[in-house]
């Protein structure tokens, strides 16, 4: 566009009608003119629309403070109080950063993302915590398995493919996907074998960590909407990952030994503090520092992009019993609802719940193993109950879980046997 000279007196703004003499500048386009005052007005309107769009349902944390987030987590996740507090603060800061009013943004202060790394044994609730956070915040959520990822050019899933499932969870709404949460499970499995840089290509380890860096930090990635490898004829969708919250989780078996060695080096001699040797694996994970993750095999750049470290403790028998009974979607409540559909009241005794917890601990599967234990114990009665009539109550006691006995059935006036 050209600026109109002072001599072109016949020209006027196509929007407000002011002449060249009435404005400071008049910009010319093909058969159209716009003055500097209309340009300023347009800028103000655009700014109002940007702020307004955040007020029209885009804000993720309407009035939710960290205490509220933790309280919501308490409804679904038993125990892990410290981890829930860490996550509540990190999530609150993340979405406040995204939803900050335009007038409060200061170019001199750049608020960086606080991606999260979750440490904890299998079945301690890492995936559940991340999933529940997304549910509380009403944002799209997806889970990716780090062990299936490879560098570009190798057989396996491209790192960018982890964005595809998030896009699908957002019903292909790119704007919603760009504010979602991605949980990358088993991140510990792609640690390099030693903490020294490798001279050879490591398809499933360091190479994948390098590939994850840009996506986790923030980049515009082109992804095939239906997944799979990219090819020239395929339509690609651009996703900006700058505001996607990444939570990486893993059991990190052996990381406790790294922490113990670090603690031991600082206390050598007659006055050495032996407390580190007496701590459990869960207690050692609570003391993890970034340098321990480097020793374990995560590359420095990736550790730097995961500044928030939260550890989850191994669940005790009491924790598992509470998980069976207390959350809003507790397993016992789910089974009770299934029996309610058949018109039967289902009751679990305290002994039966303790027996389920003991079996899950023996299998070293934590909370994840509770459902399989219950499914096995309840198979016969769930097979029979639709064929029985006049059953009013089914009581599951300890022997049903430990010895495979049949539950106690209480009938009404008329009792009907299996045919």
UniProtKB/Swiss-Prot annotation:
Cysteines engaged in disulfide bonds, as pairs: none
Keyword Zinc appears in the UniProt entry: yes
Coiled-coil regions, chain positions: none
GO cellular component, one term: HslUV protease complex
Pfam families linked to this entry: AAA_2, ClpB_D2-small, zf-C4_ClpX
PROSITE patterns assigned to the protein according to its UniProt record, in alphabetical order: CLPX_ZB
PANTHER family: ATP-DEPENDENT CLP PROTEASE ATP-BINDING SUBUNIT CLPX-LIKE, MITOCHONDRIAL (PTHR48102:SF7), ATP-DEPENDENT CLP PROTEASE ATP-BINDING SUBUNIT CLPX-LIKE, MITOCHONDRIAL-RELATED (PTHR48102)
Function comment: ATP-dependent specificity component of the Clp protease. It directs the protease to specific substrates. Can perform chaperone functions in the absence of ClpP.
Protein name, per record: ATP-dependent Clp protease ATP-binding subunit ClpX
């Amino acid at each position: 566009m050209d600026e109109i000279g002072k001599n072109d007196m016949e020209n006027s703004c196509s929007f407000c009608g002011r002449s060249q003499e009435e404005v400071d500048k008049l910009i010319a386009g093909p058969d159209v003119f716009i003055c500097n005052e209309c340009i300023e007005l347009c800028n103000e309107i655009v700014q109002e629309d940007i702020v307004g769009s955040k007020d029209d349902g885009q804000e993720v944390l309407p009035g939710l403070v960290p205490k509220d987030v933790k309280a919501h987590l308490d409804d679904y996740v038993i125990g892990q109080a410290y981890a829930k507090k860490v996550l509540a603060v990190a999530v609150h800061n993340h979405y406040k950063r995204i939803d900050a009013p335009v007038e409060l943004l200061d170019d001199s202060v750049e608020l960086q993302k606080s991606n999260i790394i979750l440490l904890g044994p299998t079945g301690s609730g890492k995936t559940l915590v991340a999933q529940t956070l997304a549910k509380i915040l009403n944002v799209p959520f997806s889970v990716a398995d780090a062990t299936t990822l490879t560098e570009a050019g190798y057989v396996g899933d491209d790192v960018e493919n982890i964005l595809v499932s998030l896009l699908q969870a957002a019903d292909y709404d790119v704007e919603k996907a760009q504010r979602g949460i991605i949980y990358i499970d088993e991140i510990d499995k792609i640690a390099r074998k030693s903490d020294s840089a490798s001279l050879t290509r490591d398809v499933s380890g360091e190479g994948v960590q390098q590939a994850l860096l840009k996506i986790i930090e923030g980049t515009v990635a082109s992804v095939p909407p239906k997944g799979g490898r990219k090819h020239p004829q395929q339509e690609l969708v651009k996703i900006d990952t700058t505001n996607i919250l990444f939570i990486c989780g893993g059991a990190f078996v052996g990381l406790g030994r790294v922490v113990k060695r670090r603690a031991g080096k600082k206390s050598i001699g007659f006055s050495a503090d032996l407390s580190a040797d007496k701590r459990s694996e869960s207690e050692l994970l609570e003391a993890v520092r970034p340098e321990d993750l480097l020793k374990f095999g995560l590359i420095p750049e990736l550790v730097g992009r995961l500044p928030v470290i939260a550890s989850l403790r191994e669940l005790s028998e009491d924790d598992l019993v509470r998980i069976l009974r207390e959350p809003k979607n507790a397993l016992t409540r789910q089974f009770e609802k299934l029996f309610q559909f058949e018109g039967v009241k289902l009751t679990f005794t305290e002994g039966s719940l303790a027996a389920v917890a003991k079996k899950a601990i023996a299998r070293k599967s934590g909370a994840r193993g509770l459902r399989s234990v219950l499914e096995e114990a309840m198979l016969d009665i769930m097979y029979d109950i639709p064929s029985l009539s006049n059953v009013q109550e089914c009581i599951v006691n300890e022997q049903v879980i430990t010895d495979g006995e049949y539950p106690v059935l209480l009938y009404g006036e008329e009792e009907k046997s299996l045919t």
